[in-house]
Amino acid sequence: MAPAVGIDLGTTYSCVGVFREDRCEIIANDQGNRTTPSFVAFTDTERLVGDAAKNQVAMNPANTVFDAKRLIGRKFSDPEVQADMKHFPFKVIDRGGKPVIQVEFKGETKVFTPEEISAMILQKMKETAEAYLGGTVNNAVVTVPAYFNDSQRQATKDAGLIAGLNVLRIINEPTAAAIAYGLDKKVEGERNVLIFDLGGGTFDVSLLTIEEGIFEVKSTAGDTHLGGEDFDNRLVNHFVQEFKRKHKKDLSTNARALRRLRTACERAKRTLSSSAQTSIEIDSLFEGIDFYTSITRARFEELCQDLFRSTLQPVDRVLTDAKIDKSQVHEIVLVGGSTRIPRIQKLISDYFNGKEPNKSINPDEAVAYGAAVQAAILSGDTSSKSTSEILLLDVAPLSLGIETAGGMMTKLIPRNTTIPTKKSEVFSTFSDNQPGVLIQVYEGERQRTKDNNLLGKFELTGIPPAPRGVPQIEVTFDVDANGIMNVSALEKGTGKTNQITITNDKGRLSKEEIERMLAEAEKFKEEDEAEAKRVAAKNGLESYAYSLRNTLSDSKVDEKLDAADKEKLKSEIDKIVAWLDENQQATREEYEERQKELEAIANPIMMKFYGAGGAPGGMPGAAPGGFPGGAPGSNDNEGPTVEEVD
């Protein structure tokens, strides 16, 4: 049984780590990369996840899904979902008030929820860990932005279930990064540490005090919809306008052209973190026009300056909430790829009166590192001294309360309350002889509930007739360590109770839906494995035929073989190669059958050459898939399948 892992499920990239024998290892995927793109692609023949999906995005923009984290746990009507849909090349539709993604897969129209797409990415991270650890991985800690609300957390937990994971805990990304920093630094005395986490799609700021293994979050703030993707969008829009000016054509009407431009913009943005200027060269971008241009760092900073500046508001808020002056912050730790942007580093440094931020931890891996440590702790691994002393105290990011007369929000749990927590308050009826009360639970900071987010509601009925203000109804809020909440109400006179686990009113997937999705995920996994075996059989046959052809052209072999045998074998090889060209989509069994036919002719002929010493199949690549590139998974994405694309 493999140990528990920590998974950073990111908007644009994901990362998995394991903590064992007193050290954390970040695990590379099958392409050798320590982060995996959070992309899932659907084609006519297969489903691709990670690098393979991102690599083919320009050829298949409408069926390549990314940014599921920007949709998860949100309503379709959410203005941010509506704004994102304008940028997405794939189709997002409304199903019961929730956004779902519609794609073409194996010739059919399929619909997937953001939870299912996220589950596919989690499953990929699970498989990456399993390949490295050599066992089944069941338990994981999954991270979310600190500013994720209740429904987004619950939906992320559901995604873990669909991926076949037991989610030990949902933890906040900046808190995970703080653990990575704290363990790495062996912090002495009490330190106030500000974590500034700006990733591909989300932004968090948390202020913690770290002292002797106790990580106490004092306050947190952020924007669940700000990150590197938004900077890419600014660049894309800038170049679309430039293309219009230069060529009088609007390339935004073409999904493929937009995708190629976006990929170039993402690369340019990264280059501008280390160079003052970079060029973009895209051949035949739109209607045969080559697009060659350049951009300076100053221009990029100008295009994004309002977004960059907006990152300081949450910093302000975190310090105010924690009642700490900026001069009392000992360390500023940068997390997330977007903190490599020099302008952002300068803004932070200026804000803290010239104090340089700490860059000692890897911004791409810190969150997975901290999650892996937390996974080791929660799965009871106390073998390491560093983990046995850690205590995490996190907070609820948003105030929680109920609606009282006049549509007012009465807060029971103010924001930045340490969790887990439990709080009760007594309410009463608003009118005489009122038989029941409707309890509506909200999260948010505004005075009126209509400006806050409704999490759920339930009724408490059967209250005996009494004048207003007499019945005593005790409402209890209970927030667990994942930041997910239970609310119960008790009428003290009759002892009647009712309760609700706030799992995103209406939007939450039901148990049946999760089970159906889990079964579907298993089915997709089996299909993926079958496809890998089919490709391996095809590669095996191809490499066997070609290696035989090479053997025949070798002069040593040529001399010793009978002309008739040689002719017979040559024509059979030509026949197989021609058949392969015609049948790229044949079944695994057909390829294996052809391999057997070829072996039946080749083996006796080659036996003559090797004399009695050469056992059948004793030559290179004789066994199916026994040739470089033949093993499943070794070359799935760039093997001989390249010839299918015309």
UniProtKB/Swiss-Prot annotation:
GO cellular component, one term: plasma membrane
Keywords noted in UniProt: ATP-binding, Chaperone, Nucleotide-binding, Stress response
Bias kind Gly residues: ranges: 613-632
One annotated GO molecular function: heat shock protein binding
BP terms from Gene Ontology: chaperone cofactor-dependent protein refolding; protein refolding
UniProt cross-references to Pfam families, sorted A to Z: HSP70 (PF00012)
Induction: By heat shock.
Listed InterPro entries: ATPase_NBD, Heat_shock_70_CS, HSP70_C_sf, HSP70_peptide-bd_sf, Hsp_70_fam
Family named by the database record: Belongs to the heat shock protein 70 family.
Name used for this protein in its record: Heat shock 70 kDa protein
Organism: Neurospora crassa (strain ATCC 24698 / 74-OR23-1A / CBS 708.71 / DSM 1257 / FGSC 987)
